[in-house]
Amino acid sequence: MEVNPPKQEHLLALKVMRLTKPTLFTNIPVTCEEKDLPGDLFNQLMRDDPSTVNGAEILMLGEMLTLPQNFGNIFLGETFSSYISVHNDSNQVVKDILVKADLQTSSQRLNLSASNAAVAELKPDCCIDDVIHHEVKEIGTHILVCAVSYTTQSGEKMYFRKFFKFQVLKPLDVKTKFYNAESDLSSVTDEVFLEAQIQNITTSPMFMEKVSLEPSIMYNVAELNSVNQAGECVTTFGSRAYLQPMDTRQYLYCLKPKKEFAEKAGIIKGVTVIGKLDIVWKTNLGERGRLQTSQLQRMAPGYGDVRLSLEAIPDTVNLEEPFHITCKITNCSERTMDLVLEMCNTNSIHWCGISGRQLGKLHPSSSLCLALTLLSSVQGLQSVSGLRLTDTFLKRTYEYDDIAQVCVVSSAIKVES
């Protein structure tokens, strides 16, 4: 008959405690009217309570701090801090003590120990203390593995370890939307607007210290989250410094291509990586958290092989009087084009000039400007349409309708105004 040997007692004891900020002590005030049976008894008890504030005893919030009563929640972007203590509970001197702390995540194992050198000896009732820090960068299950090895006086080598399992939660819900800007000429530009919606999905308020956009190398960014009032920048969020649980805040940014890249149409056309958001917040007693998103990507606007944009156009024109517009034609392809311009009249818009004229060769990423004249025979808001560009090399025609809109008024109305 086999008998399992008794479990061997270790000479050292391992204790692990998470280090977090304390919280303000709260109490539940119990009061009554003076004419009630207890009289002033409850009020006197609150005045004698050391946890209450003098002169404001009925407030739940006190001046004293309390240590955390449980492990609490750990959120992505926060710093996980833990106190590790190895105590010699025996009456023997222990030698060659090595304490190792590893953090096991779903993808990697990290060594958090400040030193990997062994301690020569540890006398009775003495301890080895260590504090570890780690910025949490993954969500999901984490396991803190603390291993202790040592040698007894008899030369026997001992080893034991403990596991501490905890979950890392997501603190923020970040949603982004991209908008390709349109100029006042009703044409798509190279500017990109980014709207970031940030929601606090924790159970405590957050102070949003910084929400910035780090653009990619091809863009400059301008934050649109403040307004200028009397020479002073004021945030658009007003006096709301805190983001309450489940509340959402929207941030807006404008990205413009740098000059050296804006002049190269083919480069900007294929750019999908915009940049990444850097979010910094503070919670209980200034406990800091930081979160960086991955590289934000957008769908690149489809300009086709030839891009037509308007450089100048009047807002209001007179009925049956010529007006001028300036067009910019850009070759977004990787080949040279030989272009022919055709102008087709519509029911309300009539082009002035020669249709079918040669524009010449246009090299890749190159542009040319055209001054065109037209008139409208119908009042009201009219759409400028009817431009056709034909590449004689490939016999391919590009049609451009609804390029812009103009308001057409009669001459009499303009004279009277």
From Swiss-Prot:
Per the record, its GO cellular-component terms are: TRAPPIII protein complex
Source domain of life is Eukaryota
- Please give one Pfam family short name: TRAPPC13_N
Q: Which InterPro entries match?
A: TRAPPC13 (IPR010378), TRAPPC13_C (IPR055428), TRAPPC13_M (IPR055429), TRAPPC13_N (IPR055427)
UniProt similarity note: Belongs to the TRAPPC13 family.
Q: How does it assemble?
A: Part of the multisubunit TRAPP (transport protein particle) complex.
Name-wise, this protein is: Trafficking protein particle complex subunit 13
| Protein species of origin | Bos taurus (Bovine)
Q: What is this organism's lineage?
A: Eukaryota, Metazoa, Chordata, Craniata, Vertebrata
